[in-house]
Amino acid sequence: MVHEDENLPVLRNVMRNFYSPLKACDPYLRFVFLTGITKFSQLSIFGELNNIKNISMDEPYAAICGITKEEMLEQMGGYIERFALSQEMSKEDTLLKLQEKYDGYHFTWPSPDVFNPFSLLNTFAKKQIGSYWFETGTPTYLVELMKLHHYPVEEIEHIVTSGPVLDSIDAASTDPVPVIYQSGYLTIKDYNAEFENYTLGFPNREVEQGFLRFLLPHYASVSISKSPYEIQCFVGEVRKGDVDGFLSRLQTFFDDTPYELALSLIHI
């Protein structure tokens, strides 16, 4: 709906009517915490509600939306040990596996590494590694946005941009990066103080694998159901040193894919 210009006035009025009563209720409200995925600029949604403090990229609150390694070790030691036992792994190897799969979020810089709490807690509850957060929703809108504006796929993990771009979204913009970042598929990897630029990338393997697997059928002639199998076959052929098998599969894979898209996927 956001990318459909004719619907913006409707969206603006709905959101403004939802938030504006908070201003009138100010004498009765001691603390209000607003959270969501996206803040849109130039929509005048918060015109009347002008006493909001945006802490999205404030360093003191960097870990407020996740679990740090220190917090996990201090408060979830028993869960880690039971999960390690169920996987027949050492505690140290279990921590490394959890970090690789679910850690790596940064909402500002500097920032501690933050685990995705939803995936971490589900892993402890089910005693099984899985893509729990990614499976709660699919990035269909993001992929459509990338295709609509011909965003180069190979640049998705090597993005350099500024803080204001990350902190709000211009509804008229053709850049999908702010939406992808604010939706949790990209995170801050580094910061250049001289130019005040942030480097973005995938936070962890759950997000990277999930996003690329979902992206693949939209850019190549492979169905969503077959893409995990194709990736597994590619990896297996590389590990076995089966060069002929790999090249044959690659040729078949890109037979019906436009040259520009094939080049983008190869760069990944």
Region annotations inferred by a language model:
Residues 184-191:
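A short, conserved structural fragment
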Residues 30-37:
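Structural recognition of the conserved hydrophobic beta-strand(s) that form the central parallel beta-sheet
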Residues 266-268:
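Conserved small/polar residues in nucleotide/adenosyl-binding loops
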Residues 41-48, 55-123:
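Amphipathic alpha-helical segments of the small helical/lid subdomains adjacent to P-loop NTPase cores
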Residues 202-231:
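Short, amphipathic alpha-helical interaction segments positioned at domain boundaries
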Residues 3-10, 44-59, 121-131, 195-197, ...:
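Short secondary-structure boundary/capping segments
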Residues 8-30:
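Substrate-engagement module of ASCE P-loop NTPases
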Residues 130-136, 144-179:
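Conserved helicase/translocase motor-coupling segment
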